[in-house]
Amino acid sequence: VGTAKSAPMTGEQKKVIFASSLGTVFEWYDFYLYGSLAIYIGATFFSQYPETTRNIFALLAFAAGFLVRPFGALVFGRLGDLVGRKYTFLVTILIMGFSTFVVGLLPGAATIGIAAPIILILLRMLQGLALGGEYGGAATYVAEHAPHGKRGYFTSWIQTTATLGLFLSLVVILLVQFMLGKEAFAEWGWRIPFLLSAILLGVSVWIRLKMNESPAFAKMKEEGKGSKAPLTEAFGQWRNAKIALLALFGAVVGQAVVWYSGQFYALFFLTGVLKVDGQSANIMVACSLLLGTGFFVFFGWLSDKIGRKPIIMAGLLLAMLTYFPLFKALTWAGNPALAQAQDTIRATVTAAPEDCKFQFNPTGTAKFTTSCDIATSFLTRNSVPYDVVTTGAAGTPATVKIGDKTISSYDAVASADQSKALDAAFQKETNLALQANGYPLVRAAAKVPDSKLDAFVAANPELGLDAAAIRAGEKATMPAADLVSGKLLTAEEAAGVTDMPVYTIDKAGPFTMVADPANVKWISIIAVLTVLVIYVTMVYGPIAALLVELFPTRIRYTGMSLPYHIGNGWFGGLLPATAFAMSAAQGDIYYGLWYPIVFAGITLVIGLLFLPETKDRDIHAMD
């Protein structure tokens, strides 16, 4: 054992790690492309359909990405324990590569109709299934090649792959956007990152074809000790099912919520809450991933010295203790004006108790129609802190009080015919009240066609506009078709019109809250994001070795894959939507952090009390 620990890595071992890691990076790259490019995919495949149909498609696509992964773990885990590690994760990479490449070629709904979103969802399901089988295969394969005393170090290279896949997807998207420009990228350029996956697929398959079967699996098959029913043995026998449950709740759930908080939720927080420009946020996250990724290998190596459990539990504890101050530091660095407003401005929503719902919206397509939900959804989208007081009378609309101003909300169902006008009026009044109380809102310019100018001036008395003076000033004449396509006029309003003057009125359009680029502290943000990534590396770096060491060879692929993908696909994958819903329910942009903190705490307690230390186990003697 001492010799194995001190001997340098052989050429064969390097090839095993490189081949396994490269293929897994490729699969994560493919998986993350969908999330990063969701807005363009939605516009191409879903936007032509009625809202209900669009919502069903979006929900199915979401479910296919995250919720299908455990089923992939069952299918390919069983296959890996029956026929071998090498051939199983060769199949997973072929499935992932094929499904990703075809997304880049798939015609949109405008060309092939409803077949487009249906095929897209089927391809996304294939991606989820393949990813469900890939990780367990790669981790098991590498661990079974690793010498005793180096499994943490060897498998830590696999742990870098999810982060490197995310990093690679962000870099490729940014480069293609830079080369093509935003318009061309939105129209067709978003397909290029999917098509480029063919290159990675070819290299990965070529390398994996040259690999040999895992020595532990080959020895087990030679001795006739393989499992004939891995699923039944892994989850139908209590002694093994108990290990799977302990792996899930004593390790993986906490790892998953810290992983998603440190990478996905941090990115969402920057763009969705702090309103930092999306491209800038992607660059900052990419920088933090680049700075932090080496710690996966460091903590994997360290776990061979001091154990898997102390490092994972320390990462969970640090995350629990520091998430609130770290995310508050992100606010002060990313949007100082918002941070100051959060300390001085607080709205009060008064509504009937039955009017306020929990706003769980994983697909981003749900519509909130009660007056309370409309008010709280608007405030949450604009990162406005608020309290909900459920003392309103039944049947009366909710009100929003900001300073000494009270604004009435509306019920979208009861006011169906007028809901668009009521929504515009509610948002405008609320924004004016927020701005008057010092909230950092910016009002964009408004483009107003001549036929609507008088009504616009009358509807915005706070601007002190003069219609005659505007008509006498600068104007642009637009053809009727452009007025309709630009949504300045409806088709009915443009009937019989050849062209019309359009006036651009400064600071008279929609209100927005955007982080001022001049005040965004890049270095501070990258520093905080890097700390969050280091927490990720602490909980994630040693976990592959831990999971491999918990299960015997005969059911290892199956046994470790299912808890890993339930934890990461369900508990982790649902984190952004659940955290946002929690923040919306409490009117506090930080309240959603209780989701990862509570689950990390549960894992910490269970892990400390019941999870065994596994670093000294001989995985070849467990059968």
Predicted regions and their residues:
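Cytoplasmic membrane-interface "Motif A"-like loop-to-helix N-cap segments
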Residues: 82-94, 305-316
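Extracytoplasmic gate region of multi-pass secondary transporters
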Residues: 34-35, 240-288, 327, 354-389, ...
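Extracellular/periplasmic helix-loop-helix junction of adjacent transmembrane segments
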Residues: 38-71
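C-terminal ends and interior cores of transmembrane alpha-helices
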Residues: 47, 94-113, 318-337, 510-517
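Hydrophobic core of transmembrane alpha-helices in multi-pass small-molecule transporters
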Residues: 106, 112-132, 337-353, 519-538
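Glycine-rich segments within core transmembrane alpha-helices of 12-TM secondary carriers
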Residues: 130, 152-177, 200, 326, ...
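Helix-loop-helix hairpin linking two adjacent transmembrane segments in secondary transporters
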Residues: 162-208
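Central cavity-lining transmembrane alpha-helices of secondary-active solute carriers
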Residues: 59-78, 97-99, 164, 286-299
